[in-house]
Structures are given as structure tokens and as C-alpha cells.
A protein has these predicted regions:
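Transmembrane alpha-helical segments of multi-pass small-molecule transport proteins
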Residues: 42, 112-117, 138-160, 174-185, ...
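C-terminal membrane-solvent junction of multi-pass transporters and transport-like membrane proteins
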Residues: 325, 339-407, 412
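Membrane-interface loop-to-helix entry segments
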Residues: 132, 145-150, 154-187, 201-203, ...
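Extracellular loop-to-transmembrane helix junctions
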Residues: 57-86, 101, 108-110, 250-253, ...
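Hydrophobic transmembrane alpha-helices that form the core helical bundles
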Residues: 109-140, 299-315, 329-330, 338
Length: 417
């Protein structure tokens, strides 16, 4: 690999690089955004219908106080890991799966990119289903056709790259902030604060606090690994990055799940499909206005899902049941967090042990990368295994094991070399 120093401060002069949204090159400093616009983008990415699913999954079998604790612990872990991965993206200027190239090699990148692509497209399709269900109440068109039309609309900003997403997010941020506040206040008012805090379920879908925390982490597991896609456009300032990410996650992934629990109690159902259909009405008192706000929430999140999926695909080819929800979120919380842990270990932890990489961020072509970096891939695989078979909070166990093993395996490999 080349020892050439990278320069993310350079102004890119190739005409097609900006058109390609810097998929394979660092984002130059003069094309980056300040913390306010980054907050708008991050907030809008966080305000997602899936957050209601997180709330209903927790509330369906945990006392509200326990659900609140699980949500708090999970979000603290999420934001801590995300701050590190987004800082890596901001510092290098590279997209998530481009960074992964250096860490795990060519074959490892194929595996990681495929997982992210499938996950992101899955969430994209799920939210299109919600879009179709909501608007079918007001427009005499079938849900599948509405979903297709919604997909075309939401893809229209994603195909324009980060610039298109930033413009939509700037427009949508204030309405979505109001939506979160109204949803929380009105839903809690309808059920009552005392009733909310005294709520105790009859079921046992989630059960333990550890599984509840894993569910919270799993609901945003893909985000931990893909936030460099967004963070690479931020100016490198760890303090502002931290503030922006904490604030965005608080509004979208803390307050909205609480509103989801309160709404589910008021509607007397834990079907998050029903909750998502009516949360807009409960928040605004108007079906149409509520549907428009839900559409904005789905659109601003789905553009990022499609954006990350397309980035992941380029790295490969170079160019309603609540039990189901819990299983999916739990699986994501086991498999994907170690991917983020590999990135953190490689870029932030290994240098502490004297292992310094000479990565040339201006050249991420596969011909300059090893076919596979076994220490990194094995650390990830072992981290997933630890998460599956260990007791406690699986996502944390998997990430910690991955970081430790990544360091150990790389130190051993370096000694042999």
C-alpha cells in the first residue's frame, strides 16, 4: 500500500468527482458543512417511523420505567459509538464502506457492504409500506402503487447525493421538530403521566433489561456503521460533532419511542403499524397534516437509507408482528455493532498500541488493498459469536470483544511480519 500522505484539505478539481458525490475520494474541506446544517440532516435521519416500532417493542413487555432505562442505556451506547465513527468519517473525508476497505480488505468489504446494502434497502422498503398504508386512507389508490410512487419521490433527493439530502433536511427539520414535541406532549397528555409511569405489561416478549437494551441498539445498529456517510461532510470539530449527534439522537430516538409507547397505550394496541398510522393524528389533530409530517419523516430517513445502500453497492461492484420486529432488531443488534467496532478499533484504538497505518485516503482502489485482512474479519466474526452466545447486553459484549480481538490479532500479525 502506498505511503503517500492523504490530504483531505485539497480542493478537488476532477469534474466528475463531485458529481459522483465523492464515493471513492475524500470530501474536500471547501465542500463541507457547518454544524447547523449537519444537525438538520442528522435530526431528519433520526426522525423515523421505526422509532415507534422501538417504543412499541419495549413497551409491549416492559414496565415503562424499565423501558425508559433500556432506552437511555441503549442511546448512550449508540451515541458514544456514533460519535467515534462519525469523527473517523469527518477526519478522513471518506464514506463508511470506503473506510471499511482499508480495515478488512476486498472480500471483507464485499461481506460488510452486502449486509449494509440489504439492511438499508430493507428499511427503505419497510417505510414505503407505511407511506402506502397512511396515504391509502386519503387517496383511492392501492397501497403497493402508493408505495412505488413514494419510493420514486424519496429516491429523487437521494440520487442527488448529500447536497440533495441537505436541502430537503433544511426544509423539513423545523416541522419534524414540532412533530416530535407535539407527538410526545399530546400522547402523554391523552394517557396521563401517572398512568404512563405506573404501566406494567402482561406479556414477556422482551423480558430482560439486557435484551431491551440490545433491541434499542439494534434499531439503530446500521446507523453506527454508516454514519461516516453523513459525517464525512462535516467540518472536523469533535465538540460540535458530539453536540449535534447527541441532540439529534435525543429528539429522534429517545423522545419519539416514548411517544410511541404512550400512543400505543392510548390506542390499546402494540401493533406499531396501527400506531404509525395514527401518530400523526394524535400529534396534530389533523389526518392530512399528520400524514404530511409522517411522509416528511419517512422521506428524510429513506433518502439516507437509499444513499447508504447505494454507497455500499458501489463498494461491491465499483460503480407487522411485534415478535418479528424484536427478532429483526435483536439480530441487527448482534451482527452490525461489531462492524462499527472494527472501524473504531482500527482507526482509533490500534494507534494507541503503536500500530500506525499509512492509509492513503486518496486511493482506495482494490488493487492497492489485500484480498482480505484476516485479523479484522476474524475479530468481527468472533465478536458476533460472543454477542450470540454470551449473557448480558449482547451488543455491548460483541463490540467489546471485537475491539479487544482486533487489537490482539493485529498485534500478533504485526509481530509475525
Amino acid at each position: 500500500m502506498s505511503d503517500k500522505k492523504h490530504d483531505v484539505n485539497a480542493v478537488t478539481t476532477e469534474p466528475n468527482v463531485e458529481d459522483q458525490d465523492y464515493i471513492y475520494t475524500p470530501v474536500p474541506q471547501n465542500k463541507r458543512y457547518g454544524w447547523i446544517k449537519m444537525f438538520f440532516v442528522w435530526l431528519c435521519w433520526n426522525v423515523v417511523v421505526g422509532d415507534l416500532a422501538t417504543g412499541t417493542a419495549l413497551g409491549s413487555s416492559m414496565k415503562f420505567r424499565d423501558a425508559l432505562i433500556a432506552l437511555s442505556i441503549g442511546d448512550i451506547i449508540l451515541v458514544a459509538v456514533m460519535i467515534m465513527t462519525v469523527y473517523i468519517g469527518s477526519k478522513t473525508g471518506l464514506a463508511a464502506m470506503s473506510l471499511i476497505r482499508f480495515t478488512v480488505g476486498r472480500v471483507g468489504t464485499y461481506i460488510f457492504s452486502a449486509i449494509i446494502c440489504v439492511t438499508s434497502v430493507g428499511w427503505f422498503a419497510t417505510q414505503l409500506g407505511f407511506f402506502g398504508q397512511i396515504w391509502s386512507q386519503y387517496i383511492p389508490i392501492s397501497v403497493p402503487i402508493l408505495a412505488v410512487l413514494g419510493g420514486i419521490m424519496m429516491a429523487s433527493t437521494a440520487i442527488k447525493g448529500f447536497k440533495g439530502m441537505e436541502k430537503l433536511s433544511t426544509f423539513a427539520a423545523i416541522p419534524l421538530l414540532l412533530f416530535i414535541v407535539l407527538a410526545l406532549v399530546n400522547c402523554v397528555r391523552l394517557i396521563g403521566v401517572d398512568s404512563l409511569f405506573s404501566y406494567s405489561p402482561a406479556g414477556s416478549q422482551i423480558g430482560t433489561m439486557a435484551t431491551g437494551v440490545t433491541t434499542v441498539i439494534g434499531s439503530w445498529a446500521a446507523g453506527m456503521a454508516t454514519v461516516p456517510d453523513c459525517g464525512r461532510f462535516a467540518k472536523t470539530d469533535i465538540i460540535k460533532i458530539s453536540i449535534v449527534w447527541i441532540a439529534g439522537l435525543f429528539f429522534g430516538h429517545f423522545l419519539l419511542p416514548i411517544a410511541g409507547i404512550a400512543a400505543a397505550l392510548h390506542l390499546e394496541t402494540w401493533d406499531f403499524g396501527v400506531v404509525s398510522d395514527y401518530i400523526g393524528v394524535l400529534a396534530t389533530g389533523s389526518g392530512i397534516i399528520g400524514a404530511l409530517l409522517i411522509t416528511l419523516a419517512a422521506w428524510t430517513t429513506n433518502q439516507q437509507n437509499l444513499y447508504s445502500a447505494s454507497n455500499a453497492t458501489c463498494n461491491i461492484i465499483e460503480v407487522k408482528k411485534k415478535s418479528t420486529v424484536t427478532i429483526v432488531l435483536g439480530a441487527l443488534g448482534i451482527v452490525i455493532p461489531p462492524m462499527a467496532a472494527v472501524m473504531v478499533a482500527d482507526y482509533l484504538v490500534l494507534p494507541l498500541f503503536g500500530v500506525k497505518h499509512n492509509y492513503n485516503y486518496n486511493d482506495i482502489s482494490y488493487e492497492n488493498l489485500p484480498l482480505i485482512k484476516w485479523p479484522s474479519v476474524l475479530a468481527w466474526g468472533c465478536g458476533v459469536a460472543v454477542a450470540i452466545f454470551s449473557p448480558g447486553i449482547q451488543a455491548i459484549n460483541g463490540m467489546v470483544a471485537t475491539v479487544v480481538l482486533h487489537v490482539v490479532f493485529n498485534l500478533v500479525a504485526n509481530k509475525k511480519n
